[in-house]
Structures are given as C-alpha cells and as structure tokens.
Amino acid sequence: MRTVLVTGSADGIGRHAAAQLIAGGHRVIVHARNEDRAADAKAALPGAAGVAVGDLSSLAGTTALAGSLRAYGRLDAVVHNAGIARLDSSERELTGDGLESMFQVNVLAPYLLTALLPQPGRLVFVSSAMAAGGAVDLADLQFDRRPWNGFTAYSTTKLLDLMLAVAIARRWPSTLSNALDPGWVRTKMGGDTAPADPEDAARAEVRLATGTGPGVQVTGRYFTDRDWQPDGTVLDPALLEALLAHCADLTGVQLPGDEQGGPAA
C-alpha cells in the first residue's frame, strides 16, 4: 500500500486516478481548490484517506496546502494532475499574486508544493502533447513582453512541467520524477469530442505513481504515445537549473537537496 496525493482530483482524470488507486488498496489523499469542490470529491471518493483543500492559483493557498498535507507523513507519490487552460483567451489573466494564471497553477504551484513537502518516492507531472508547441524564454516565462497567445502560453506551461520533472530527477536521484502526456481526454477541459477515455488516462497516472517493473521504475522521462520528444536544447542541465532558480525566486522557496541520499528505487 502506498500513500498517494493526486492534485485536482475533484473531477476529471484526477478523480478517475484517485478512484483507481483507492480500488487498488492505496491510501489516497484527494485535493480540491475550495470547500465546495472538496465536498464533491469526498462524496465521489468515500474511500479516500482525506481531502486536502488548497487554491493553487495562490502562493499562500499552495503553502497552506503543503502544511496541511504534512499530517499524512512522507508521501510515497505525488501526482501533479491539477491544471487550467485558457487556449482562446485574448489577454493575460493575473492571479492575486500578480502572476499569469496558467503559469502559476500549472508550473509554479507544483514546484512550490514539491519544494515544501517531504521528498516523496515518486513524482508524476502531467504534461501534454501540446508541449511540442511550447516556447521557453526564461526572461519572459509569463508572456509579459511577448505577444499574448493563449495556445502558446498553455503549451509552454506543459513544456515547463516536463522540464520540471527532469530537473527534479537530476536534483533528487532517489525520487522517480517523470512527466506524462495523458492524451486528448474527454473531460471538461478536453471536451466531449476528445478521443481518449479518462479511465485510460488515469491508468497511465496510476502506473507511474505505483507501478513496478523496468518500464516505470525510471526517472527523468517523458511518457507519451506521440512521436515527439523534447530535444537537448530544453533539457540542457544549465537551463533546467535556471528554471528551478526562477521558480525559487518567484516563490521564495528553494528546492532542497536530496534527502534520501541514494539512487531511485
């Protein structure tokens, strides 16, 4: 039995993943952004070990979420499933922290949560095939100066999620840290015409979080059914370290060194 946190598990792929983990006998903590959605998650997933509430569009909310999660002890796995998309937006949307909303929820929140929690055994960052269309500029990650394009901005956050997974895999060799493209899935975000079943997408998350065998006991990988893989440019170690430093500057929290002191297992 593993203790697993699935963020954004009030509905969509996250709820399916949490349900599958519970059915598999695991101790599962589900997450919702507010109390109303937490009540929905609790009703839908009565076998969950707990429901954690925290608004990932707020630095204070994410920090408080990490504090509440410490009551569960060291987590075996964290699935960073929560995310938002504003593909057709005509202009940037800022959070209360003055940060671009997709960047804060999709990238900065999983970084901050990871940095604040005791180092887990596994990390799963949910990326997207749209990462292939991302355009990383560390001097302008939030599109302050570049012309705004919601599609490109979202794609960039998904590429940054992939980069975070690899960067943390390098920093924490005793944690299995990987990124996953779940496909175009029939959810509120993906729409009713999407071809992929959320149950199948959830199984991919569960496999990376709890599976055994050489296929999943790896680290620093991007799992996808598509042909595209990131090239060495975006996975350059110096760029990855610069991304971690940028996230640390924005949050005021450094990602600590490897607490386990050994190779991933």
Positions of PLM-derived features:
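Canonical Rossmann dinucleotide-binding motif of NAD(H)/NADP(H)-dependent dehydrogenases/reductases
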Residues: 1-29
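Conserved glycine-rich Rossmann-like NAD(P)H-binding loop of the short-chain dehydrogenase/reductase
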Residues: 24-40
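Rossmann-fold cofactor-recognition segment
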Residues: 45-60
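Conserved Rossmann-fold cofactor-binding substructure of NAD(P)-dependent oxidoreductases
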Residues: 57-73
